[in-house]
UniProtKB/Swiss-Prot annotation:
GO biological process, one term: rRNA base methylation
Gene: rsmH
Catalysed reactions, as listed in the record: cytidine(1402) in 16S rRNA + S-adenosyl-L-methionine = N(4)-methylcytidine(1402) in 16S rRNA + S-adenosyl-L-homocysteine + H(+)
Pfam families: Methyltransf_5
NCBIfam families: 16S rRNA (cytosine(1402)-N(4))-methyltransferase RsmH
UniProt name for this protein: Ribosomal RNA small subunit methyltransferase H
Phylogenetic placement of the source organism: Bacteria, Pseudomonadati, Pseudomonadota, Alphaproteobacteria, Rhodobacterales
GO molecular-function term, one example from the UniProt record: rRNA (cytosine-N4-)-methyltransferase activity
Ubl conjugation recorded as keyword: no
Organism of this sequence: Jannaschia sp. (strain CCS1)
Binding site for S-adenosyl-L-methionine: 37-39, 55, 82, 99, 106
Disordered: region residues: 303-327
Places the protein is found: Cytoplasm
Length: 327
């Protein structure tokens, strides 16, 4: 297992853009998606005094054992989820970095069940606890499966795929990645040159559901607001439109003072922004980075700077989190 991971490239996406946009890097940063450690190392070498590396996958820290010690006390590793990152730091943070992509070491290990390109058990759990993809695919009602595929994967053929999954699981339990990928492929047109694999959206949707990725993201963004000192930076890298919308809506909501409202309605109290947007628009990878790392092609970086206003919660409906009945 270790040899298979070591052969895979672990290239942190948009790290150079983060270091450039938040310069000068200093103080205490929290890398909420430690993974292979690319962001943590980049931040330390870029000027951070301390980086707290957080991950819910114990394998991340097992793989870091060979190099983490070279940073001494400057690198602190903590198992947990970034949804409660404000409880994992003993001091106000100068920066929080979140890379919302699945780490390459998870994708490249067939036994983790994330990839439709390698046969393995249908798992997809990032933390190895809770309901697995196999449990969800075999036990969820057809309507819930269709809603998950549509809401989390933006899969237009969601109902057709859910129906096919239910029909197949009546014959035998669906327990491998290639078995599920094959069911999905039969429901969709053949892949054309340049198109993504037909199972991409379905696997994304099931992974998001299994790991509660949207709920974790919403909680993590609010936790970052609580944890950052005034002037601290929040840098978030997203990889698909659904999660980017959540980040965009959060940053827009918490950098706004409120709309003009109606002259016929009672005057609402003005909101005090918890962030300023720096820059206001998302930053994409440049052509050179995409050429070096094709996984970067859909990535977007959004950065916000903390103000001194008190942190405020944001309702899930404001962030556009899908509300699935029965899930």
């Amino acid at each position: 297992m270790t040899d298979e991971i070591d052969k895979a490239p672990h290239i942190p996406v948009l790290l150079g853009a983060i270091l450039r946009e938040v310069a000068p890097v200093s103080g205490v940063w929290l890398d909420g998606t430690f993974g292979a450690g690319g962001y943590a190392r980049g931040l330390l070498e870029g000027g951070a005094d301390t980086v707290i590396g957080v991950d819910r996958d114990p394998l991340a820290f097992e793989m870091a054992a060979d190099w983490a010690g070279s940073y001494g006390d400057a690198l602190r590793l903590k198992e947990g989820t970034f949804s409660n990152l404000d409880t994992l730091a003993d001091e106000p943070l100068d920066g929080v970095a979140l890379d919302l992509g699945v780490s390459s070491m998870q994708l490249d290990l067939a036994e983790r069940g994330f990839s439709f390109m390698r046969d393995g058990p249908l798992d997809m759990r990032m933390g190895q606890i809770g309901v697995s993809a196999e449990d969800l695919v075999n036990d969820a009602p057809e309507k819930l499966l269709a809603d998950i595929l549509f809401q989390y994967g933006e899969e237009r053929a969601a109902r057709r795929i859910a129906k096919a999954i239910v029909a197949e699981r009546l014959k035998c339990r669906i327990n491998s990645t290639l078995q599920l990928a094959g069911i999905v492929e039969k429901c969709l047109p053949s892949k054309k040159p340049g198109q993504s694999h037909p199972a991409t959206r379905s696997f994304q949707a099931i992974r998001i559901a299994v790991n509660d990725e949207f709920g974790q993201l919403a909680q993590g963004l609010m936790a970052a607001e609580r944890a950052l000192r005034p002037g601290g930076k929040l840098a978030v890298v997203t990889f698909h439109s659904s999660e980017d919308r959540i980040v965009k809506k959060f940053m827009s909501e918490r950098s706004s003072t409120g709309g003009g409202g109606s002259r016929y309605a009672p005057e609402a109290a003005a909101k005090v922004p918890g962030f300023t947007l720096t820059p206001r628009k998302a930053i994409p990878p440049d052509a050179d980075e995409i050429a070096r790392n094709t996984r970067a092609r859909s990535a977007k970086l959004r950065i916000a700077t903390r103000t001194d206003a008190p942190a405020q919660p944001v309702a899930p409906e404001t962030l556009g989190l899908p509300q699935l009945e029965g899930f």
